[in-house]
Amino acid sequence: MDIKLKDFEGPLDLLLHLVSKYKMDIYDVPITEVIEQYLAYVSTLQAMRLEVTGEYMVMASQLMLIKSRKLLPKVAEVTDLEDDLEQDLLSQIEEYRKFKLLGEHLEAKHQERAQYYSKAPRELMYEDAELVHDKTTIDLFLAFSNILAKKKEEFAQNHTTILRDEYKIEDMMIIVKESLTGRDQLRLQDLFKEAQNVQEVITLFLATLELIKTQELILVQEESFGDIYLMEKKEESQVAQS
């Protein structure tokens, strides 16, 4: 069972999303935290053997340079270069934000004008099932990036052997649903507590994505950087009875 992921429009689109979660001026965000989230996100995609295009890797190398500069002793010349690199990055994100807002405004105007013209009905085209990167799904990936990093560290400390067992997404979907039996919701990180190796962690996550795609599960996150909870999607009849 394959799960395809649509990319962001580019690395700046991903960075803008990460920055916007802080709900403050772009130039005031903790840039080191943003860099770590970006690198963790890309690392997770690679661990899941999903394609990461070259432009994301180029940006990753630039971000690692900025991060490494911040770890160096505070020498005047180095500090100036570090500030230049950081300000240049933030300026790129700010410029991208403005262009994106302009694009959204123009698209809204286009849709408004389109309402004045009748259009012939178009045949609906269905592609292979894809999980689109909406904001909630992006936050899910970011949360999983942190979980995967912590589990890798845990396995390393416990000298856990990486087994070559073939975990099936279909089997893991059953496990995910069973984990919700008798409870209203499940905190995302609690789903992976009993996982024995990285492959099991990743397959559990893919199973979760599949259940979200098939609308058997929904995500709840009440605030930026808050815990993400999984909930079974109730049928309308169940909602009416509750």
UniProtKB/Swiss-Prot annotation:
Q: Which InterPro entries match?
A: ScpA, ScpA-like_C
The alphabetical list of record keywords is: Cell cycle, Cell division, Chromosome partition, Cytoplasm
GO biological process entries: cell division; chromosome segregation; DNA replication
Q: What do the Gene Ontology cellular component annotations say?
A: cytoplasm
Q: Which domain of life is it from?
A: Bacteria
Q: Per the annotation, which location comes first and is thus the protein's main one? A: cytoplasm
> Where does this one sit in the cell?
Cytoplasm
Q: What does this protein do?
A: Participates in chromosomal partition during cell division. May act via the formation of a condensin-like complex containing Smc and ScpB that pull DNA away from mid-cell into both cell halves.
Family per similarity comment: Belongs to the ScpA family.
Record text on subunit structure and interactions: Component of a cohesin-like complex composed of ScpA, ScpB and the Smc homodimer, in which ScpA and ScpB bind to the head domain of Smc. The presence of the three proteins is required for the association of the complex with DNA.
Protein name from the UniProt record: Segregation and condensation protein A
Q: What organism does this protein naturally occur in?
A: Streptococcus mitis
